[in-house]
Structure formats: C-alpha cells, structure tokens
Amino acid sequence: MDLKAQSIPFAWLDRDKVQRLTNFLSNLENLENVDLREHPYVTNSCVVREGEDVDELKTLYNTFILWLMYHYVLSKRKPDYNAIWQDITKLQNVVNEYLKSKGLNKGNFENMFTNKEKFESQFSDIHRALLRLGNSIRWGSNVPIDTPYVNLTAEDSSEIENNLQDAEKNMLWYTVYNINDPWDENGYLVTSINKLVYLGKLFVTLNQSWSKLEKVAMSQIVTTQNHLSGHLRKNENFNAVYSQRVLQTPLTGQRVESFLKIITSDYEIIKSSLESYSASKAFSVPENGPHSLMDFASLDGRMPSDLSLPSISIDTKRPSADLARLKISQPKSLDAPLKTQRRHKFPESDSVDNAGGKILIKKETLGGRDVRATTPVSSVSLMSGVEPLSSLTSTNLDLRDKSHGNYRIGPSGILDFGVKLPAEAQSNTGDVDLLQDKTSIRSPSSGITDVVNGLANLNLRQNKSDVSRPWSKNTAANADVFDPVHRLVSEQTGTPFVLNNSDVAGSEAKLTTHSTETGVSPHNVSLIKDLRDKDGFRKQKKLDLLGSWTKEKNDKAIVHSREVTGDSGDATETVTARDSPVLRKTKHANDIFAGLNKKYARDVSRGGKGNSRDLYSGGNAEKKETSGKFNVDKEMTQNEQEPLPNLMEAARNAGEEQYVQAGLGQRVNKILAEFTNLISLGEKGIQDILHNQSGTELKLPTENKLGRESEEANVERILEVSDPQNLFKNFKLQNDLDSVQSPFRLPNADLSRDLDSVSFKDALDVKLPGNGEREIDLALQKVKAGERETSDFKVGQDETLIPTQLMKVETPEEKDDVIEKMVLRIRQDGETDEETVPGPGVAESLGIAAKDKSVIAS
C-alpha cells in the first residue's frame, strides 16, 4: 500500500492535517521514538470539529484509520535481525570450543542457542553463565562481580546502555555498538564473551520492543473498531448495516493489511453511513424504539418507498414537526378529549395515502374496538360507533370540498357523495360547521376511492354512549327498514341490492308527501316504529333459511315486490326480477368489471348458488306472478341472512329514528347500495356469460310448446353460435415464413407459403427446372472431394467432376435417361458405397431426396 495522502482513507480533515499524518507514517523509522503514544500532535490531527464542538464519531473513525496505518507501517518496516543472530551464533561457537577444550561442555550451553525463541526465553540464564565464565577467565576465580560486562570501563558500559535504550525506542532503525579491546587487556575470549552478552541484549530488546508496540496498536484498533460498529448498530439503512458488517470483521496482526484494502475500497459507503449517523444523532430516539417498516401495510399491498414512517403521536416539542401543518381538534362539549397514545406495535394496520401524508388505520375497527389513526397532515381519529343526534355538537367533522361537487357527512356518520344538503336538513346539524375544512383535494377516480378517502378523512370524537352492535338481536333486522323509499332486498345470491320505487314508472312512492323538516311524513315515521315490533321482522334460524332455499331452488322464481303504505291508503306493487332497474345497473357494472365475477360463474351457469337459472326462466317467473303478491317483510323473515359486519354496513345499519328524521337516510342508502352493487361478485347472470366477443347478446327461446323453458334448445343455440369449426375460420399467419435450408438438402425448396391454404407436400416435392443441367453441375461440384477421379466420376474441362455416363452422351434426352438410371440405382442400393465414391454420397452430391419409389425430374 502506497503511503500517499490521497491513498490513505482519512475523512473530514483539512489538507494540512492529512499531510501531517502522512508525513508521520512515511518517516516513522527516522524518528527517535516510534511509539505513536509519544506523539500527541499526531493524534490531535484526527480531531473533527463541527463549529465549537468535537464530532466524536468522525474523530473516532480517523483515529481508527491512523492506528491501522501505524500497524501497517510498523509491520512493513520491521527488520528481520538476522545479522545480529548470525553474529551471536559465531560468538557462541568460540565460547563452545573453549569449553570443549577444558572439558566443561556437557551440552547444556550449546542447546541454549538452537533457535531464537529458546534463546530469548532463556537469555537471563545465559547472561549469568557468560558473566561467571568471563570473570573466571579474566580474574582466575569464580567470584561473581556485579557488573554487566567483564572488565569494561564505566564509560563503555554507559555507551552500550544508551545504545540499547535507543534500540528500544526505535527498533526499526538501530546501530550496533562496537566492543573492542585495543590494548588486548582482556584477550580475545573475554572480548568475545562481552560481545555475546551485548548482542544477546540487543536482540532481545529489539524483539520485545516491537512486539510491545504491535500489541498496543492491535489493542487500539480493536477498541476503536468496537466503538464504531456499536454506533452504526443503531442505524438500519443499507450503508450503515454494510459498514457495521465490515467493521465487525475479526482482526489479527496478519489481517490488518487486507482489512485496510477493504476500508479503502468501501470508503464512500462507510463515510456516508457515519455522516448519516452524525446527522441523526441530534434527534432524540423514543424509548420504545422506532417502528419497524414491516409492522405496517398499505391498502394496495405495496410497501412505502421511504424507510421511516410518521410517528403515531404528534409531539409539538420536537423541532422537526411542522406546526403550521398540524390541525389539533378542540372538543366543544364537556366530554373528555381523546388522547393519542403511542403504540409500540401494530400487528395489522392499513396505510392510506391522503394528501401527501400517511393515515394509519387499525383493522380492528370492524369488531367495535377502539381505533386511533393519525397523520402528519391532519389529526385524524376514527372511533367505532356513531354518536346520537343529541351529542352531535361535540363532534368535530373534517370535510373537504371537491371540484366536481360536495360530499358531506350526515348525522349518521355516513358519507353522502355528490349530493348537496338542503337548507332545512343542514340547519338541523346544530352548531357544527359542515364545511369546516375547505381544503381542496384531488378528486377520486371511482366510487371505491370516494368511500376509502371519505372514511379516511373522518374525524369523529369518541362518544361515551354505547352503541349496540349492528345485526344484534335487540335491534331490528337491519337499519334499512327505517327508510320507506330505499329498502335492501336480499337476493338468493347472498348480495343485497336496492329496490327503489323512484326508479319504477308510475310508482305511487313518488306521490308520498314528506315534511320539509325531516324529509319523511309523520305517518310513515309512526309506521316505522310499529314495524320494529312486528313478528315478521324477527330473525329466523339459519336451518330454516337453508331449508327454504332448498325447497324453492328448482321450481320457483324469485319475484321481488314490496308493499308500500302511504298517507292516502295502502297500495301494493310488484316488480319482477327481470325488469328490476337494479339488475340493469348490476349488469352494467358486471360489464365494467367482467374479470371480478369468476368466483360465482360456475354456480350461475349451472343454476347452483343463487339459483340464477330460475331467475331467468320466464315460465316460472310468470307462474310466480300469478300466484299472488307477497310482502317483503315475510320474505325477509323466510330468507333472513346475516351479512358479515364490515365498516360500511356497520355504519349503514346503525341508524336510529333520529337519523331518519334528519332526511339523510335515503341518500345514504342509495349511495351505499350503488357502491355495493358495483363491487358485487355474485350477480353475474347467464346473459353476461353468453355475451360474445362481438358485443351482441344471444336471444334464447324462453318458452316451448309446453310452456316451459327448453334448456336443450338453449344449449344447442349456444353451441351453434360458438361453433368450433368457425373459430379459426379467418385465421392466417401475419408474417410469411422465411426460406429455410432443408436438412435433406432439397434444391431451393420454397417454404415461404401460407399454411392455411397450402400443405407441405408441394413444398417437399423435388422440381428441377428445365432439364436439370444447372442443378446437376452444382451437385457435381459438391462431390469434388480430394480432387480424385473415380470409376463413376471424371474431371471435365472446367475442373468439375462429371459422371462417366454423362461424358458419353450428347443430347439432353440421353442425359435424362442416364440421370434416371443413376437415381434408380441409388434407390436400390441405398447411398453409394464409401469405397466407390469418397466423400459425400451420390444422393447428397446431386441434392436429390427421392420420395416413395420414384423421382420425377423435370
């Protein structure tokens, strides 16, 4: 690794500091002391300041890089000390020879110099033994003398000691002190012992000092590495996770160099992760931690693109919150205000994108549980249950105008799209400003978008009064019985649809007079109260319901009728299922959403679930009409079914008489019924199934001679229209096939023909234009293998191989005879034997593939 300023991965430092750090590392062996701890100005160059404050994380990173580079240079510049060891072994041999001559060598002294590690570990014993031996040689006695060397002056001893200290401070660049005896006072043997002692001390000092600094550097590297990875563990973006994995790499002295290369290559990723952490540490992290992205799911099944989600509660003390965009609702009554609480986990939640913000709606709304949802744009709180009219003044409604119309929230808490409230009905809402928020939003594109966005913008305060669960036994069959104009009639398909008297021509419902205050006549209100106590509206067991469906499945048609009682008297009218305007709306909706009705296609076509076959049988329908009228109340008693509670039906069926008096039940039921019919999956009739691709409808015979429907005739008519023979009548390939090379080497067989009118037989026939002279010449050229003549072929004037028989003929007729004979011989004997003709066979050379037993050459 090159020690240049641009190659060392320091970050957030100015040029002077980087140059100072680079110079220190480049000139490390020239310093008096190579210990990094002895150079505080170098470590201070790693400090990164943000104004007057020190960025601890960035400073820690630069310190980490500095210690990595220090360890790298310390390892690369370390000498091997082999020269010192060679001198030690030479001097050891001199001493060993003397011991052998005196008979004192027993092998112990020699074994101490076998390897460097053993010498370094046993050097203290070697030192004492050498001093005792030198003193005995120099002074003639074995008396120990407390001197580091044998018969050296104090000045020499001091210089040697200084030399060892310098080697300890800088083991990368050292000098060897020369011990000599100019006046031969000690002799060669004693001088050799003094040199051996000094070199032994120098060798041990160099090794131990380097090992000490290497351990210090590794300790600093590991400590700084753990601190950095610990900081990045709190961040969850990709760069932080990747950098954390890199910093968690186990390091040893041998792996520092490779780790430095990884840091250098991933410098930008690690730098950006540290910058993002430094920028985010100024914001406080909540005690329960940030919400995980996987705890939330959007309505469309896609995850949000951003990695951070809005907080569940709004903290006005946080500097990052935009107070101008927050809308805090104030209660207008003595009811306790709703307090938004932080939830640590939302196991199931929906995310609705509304005007640039996220509205989190919990899915337990349907079960009557408490639901809280907030958004950064506006404080939204959707509560289960509907407040009565008396407490409506404490409700804060958040409504928005649309460019194509206004939609409001009536007293029942249900959206009324595209319908403007009359002045009389709007005056009954008390002190509530229905147009409190006039912020324009983007217009929805469909009915389902209107409902979803409208429900998301509800801002209803929780009511202390308990509202009973819709479809409970202490409530009427459903809330639709309170509306004298719209009534939900249950079809046998299980999907309710609206039977509206206002859609029937000549209906007497149009003559019903309504009060200007409530929209409902007082007489009808009293009748509605009486209807609640009737036995006909009480629920029947599900077993009886299934029994009644089975009994009427095959021999009765469904005829939807109702009995309407007005102020002038009782009037009864019948609307058949075939002529019902709702079925026309349903059919139109099914044409739009044709792909949504696959679920019940099998049941409808076979007369299964829903008994739709009887629905379109004219004979049974007319028989049902003549049998008499029946009251829809009794039909609801017999065919009672209990739909699954959902958000729309719970709000629709939770109405009380005060909502009817407000005059909004009609509009509400109409809008919700149209939406229900729009998304229904069970009302696709047989006419929609038989709807062909051209857009015309099949006219099926409804009666035969016996007055009953002829199912066989209908089936034949269906099969006749969808005749499989005519299915590919006009089928033709748009693009002609390109000419291909036949594997049998057909001579220019033209295969680029239409497949619908021409077979492959004509394309495979062999046709030689004229007398075939050109084709024969081309074929004979292919047989030219090895430039040799054979018994069957000879070289012509144009250097082409020509059959011998053709060399003797002159007229075209004779050539044709020769060719015919050759082909017959090929057919009888198979391909020409390889011994006779080398290379490709005659059939291949001629390019002819015979069919059957003869070949026609034209």
Curated annotation (Swiss-Prot):
Chain intervals for the UniProt region annotation (Disordered): 603-629
GO molecular function: structural molecule activity
Primary localization: virion
Signal peptide segment: none
Keyword field contains Phosphoprotein: yes
PTM description: Phosphorylated at multiple sites.
Record keywords, A-Z: Phosphoprotein, Virion, Virion tegument
Cell compartments where the protein resides: Virion tegument
GO CC terms, sorted: viral tegument
Pfam family, one: Herpes_UL32
InterPro entries in UniProt: Herpes_UL11/UL32
Recorded family membership: Belongs to the herpesviridae large structural phosphoprotein family.
Subunit structure, interactors included: Homotetramer. Interacts with the major capsid protein. 180 tegument protein pU11 tetramers bind to the virion capsid.
Protein name (database record): Large structural phosphoprotein
Organism: Human herpesvirus 6B (strain Z29) (HHV-6 variant B)
